[in-house]
């Protein structure tokens, strides 16, 4: 009697079934990963990309703003007048800044000088200065605004606008800081 070796076929079938089961598990895992990527991760990355694009456009606008602000040239002295040339569109003279006392009061120019045309002559400027000096003298008892002493009882007895700050405290200077290039 010849003995046959143990059945090799059941072992091959068993291995084939185990391989098929493992491949099915791998396929299920890949399907779950694909679903997670397409439903959760890709939309989140797209939203993040939109936010980054918005931030990038805002930053490029700020970069342009700062670059253009660094190109500004501040005039420290008035420019020399250009030679007189005829223009089709004559420009009105620039408005003058009002004169202010050390207490912050705006000095009004007398009405009579408003009626006179401003030709910029030396006599007219001297005349305006005299009127202004007279106005200061009448209002404050002194023609010098730099040595102003309040004689008004309302200015001396007015309470401070804040309990933490005395009226004699100077305003802190404004400080602007820019990053160095």
Swiss-Prot record:
Query: What keywords is this UniProt entry annotated with?
Result: Cell cycle, Cell division, Centromere, Chromosome, Chromosome partition, Cytoplasm, Cytoskeleton, Kinetochore, Microtubule, Mitosis, Nucleus
Subcellular location per the Swiss-Prot or TrEMBL entry: Nucleus; Cytoplasm, Cytoskeleton, Spindle; Chromosome, Centromere, Kinetochore
The answer to whether keyword Nucleus applies is yes
The biased composition feature labelled Low complexity covers: 133-165
Question: What's an example GO cellular component term for this entry?
Answer: mitotic spindle
Specify the superkingdom: Eukaryota
Function comment = Component of the DASH complex that connects microtubules with kinetochores and couples microtubule depolymerisation to chromosome movement; it is involved in retrieving kinetochores to the spindle poles before their re-orientation on the spindle in early mitosis and allows microtubule depolymerization to pull chromosomes apart and resist detachment during anaphase.
Name of the molecule in the record: DASH complex subunit ASK1
User: Taxonomic lineage of this organism?
Assistant: Eukaryota, Fungi, Dikarya, Ascomycota, Saccharomycotina
